[in-house]
Swiss-Prot record:
It is found in: Membrane. It is a multi-pass membrane protein. NCBIfam families: amt. This is Ammonium transporter 1. Transporter for ammonium to use as a nitrogen source. Under ammonium limitation acts as an ammonium sensor, generating a signal that leads to pseudohyphal growth. Belongs to the ammonia transporter channel (TC 1.A.11.2) family. Residues 54-63, 144-150, 209-223, 275-281, 325-338, 416-497 are cytoplasmic. The lineage of its organism: Eukaryota, Fungi, Dikarya, Ascomycota, Taphrinomycotina. One of its GO terms (cellular component) is Golgi apparatus. It comes from Schizosaccharomyces pombe (strain 972 / ATCC 24843) (Fission yeast). It holds the Pfam family Ammonium_transp.
Amino acid sequence: MSSTTDATPTPSGVNGGDSMTVNLNQFYNNGDVAWILTSTALVFIMIPGVGFFYSGLARRRSAISMLFLSMMSVAIVAFQWFFWGYSLTFSHEGGPYIGSLANFGLRQTLGRPSSGASSVPDILFCVFQGMFAAITPALAIGAAADRGRMFPCMVFMFLWTSIVYDPIAFWTWNPNGWLNKLGSYDFAGGSPVHISSGMAALAYSIVIGKRCDHGTTKYRPHNVPHVVLGTVFLWFGWFGFNGGSSAAANMRGVMAVVVTHLAASVGGIVWCVIDFAKNRHWSVVGFCEGAVAGLVAITPGSGFVPPWAAVVIGALGAVFCYAATYLKKIIRVDDALDIFAEHGVGGMVGNILTALFAADYIEALDGSGTAYTGGWITHHYIQLGYQLADTVSCAAYSFAVSCALLFVMNYIPGLSLRVSREDEVLGLDKIELGESAYYYKDSTDEPPPITTSGVQYTSPTVSDSASNEKEQEHRAQNEAQKEEEYRAESEAQAPAI
C-alpha cells in the first residue's frame, strides 16, 4: 500500500471527524478518492469472477454451489469487516501481530486518514480493503467443490477471516505489523490474499478428504464458457486490485496496471504453449489458468517491478503453477480446482521474484519522496531474506491455523464439513441448494401427426397415476442417458484438471 498526502485531519468523537463543523473533504484529493472508489468496484467484480471460474471447472452438479459460496463470501465478510475485521487489521493502535478494537463497528473512521494509506480516509480504505478480505475466503473455499456442506463453509469464512486473514494482513500492511517493519514487499496481497488462501485450500482438501470417485474418474471442466467469463471478470477487476493498491491516483498505480496486464498475457501464452507441447492441441482452459497464474504472481510486486520484469514473472508464474498442479498427485491430496497450485505456489513465486526485480525508481513513482531500496537489481540483496521470511511465516501460519480450525469444526455437531456419499453422487446443487444450473426440456413430447391435407391433429390424453409413473421413469432414464453422453463428450474434448 502506498500514500502521498500531508493532510491529516484531527479526529474527534466516535466518528473520526466532526462533519458538522469541518469540511472533511478538504483533507483529501478528489482524484484519489475517485480512483479508490472505482478500484473498489473493480475488485468487487472479481468475486463473482471467482464463482464463475470455479463453477466452470467444477462438475455440473456443483455449478451453482460455487457461485453461491462466492457471493456469500461478499455478504459474510462485509459484516465481519464492519464488526471487527477492519479494526483488527488497520486500527491505528496495536502490537506487532494484531490490531486493537478501537475501530470496532467502524468507530472513528469517518474523516481520519487510514493507517494503511494516509491519502484516503478510513471509511474509504475500509470498503476498498473489505473487498480484498471478501475475495480471499472465496478463493479458498473452492476446495469444498463437489463434497462440502454449505453451512460449515459459511461459518469457516467468518472464523477464518478473523483468525487468519486479519492477522496476516495486519503483519503485512499495518505500519505496526512485524513484516511491514521488517521491510518485506507486498504491494497488493501476495501473502494476505494468495498464499493464505492457497494454504487454506490445501488444509481444507486434506481435512475434508477426497471425492468419492477420486482416482477412478478423470475430472473435466463442465462449462468452459463459465471459465472464460470468470477469467475476464478477474482480469478486468485485477486492474483495480493492483492499481488501486497505490491508494492514490499516481504514476505508481499506472505502472501497477501495466505490469498486471503484461504478466497475465504472458502467463496465458506460456501455459498454452506448455499444454500444446504436452497434448498437441491448444486449450482455452489452459490459457485461462495461465492468465490467472500470471496475475497471482505479479500481485506482490506490481508496485515494485518494471515492465520487463513483469514478462519474466508472468512466464515463471505460469511454469511453476503448471508444475504445481502435479503436486497433488505426489502428496495424494484432492485439491479439486488446483487452488493451492494457482494461488499458494503462485503467491510464493511472486514474493520471491519481487525480491529479485524490485526497482527503486518504480517505488519512487508515487512521488512521496521516501527513501527506497529496491531489490537485487539495485543491489539490495537482503530483500530476498525479508521476502522468504514473509513467505514462510504466512504460509505456515495459514496452513496450521486452517487445519486446526477445520479439524475442530468437523467434530462439532452441525458443522461436519462433508456431505454423505449418497448426497455427493446426487450433487451439492440438488442436496444443499435444491436448485440446478441446467434444466432440460423432457423429450417425451411427440410432435402431432400431419395428415395429407396438411392439418395437424392432436388427441386428448387422460393423465392417471400409471401414466405419471411411466413419465417419471422415462424422465429419469432420459436424464441418466444425457449425463453419460455429457461425460463421454467432456472426456473426449476438454483438458483434464
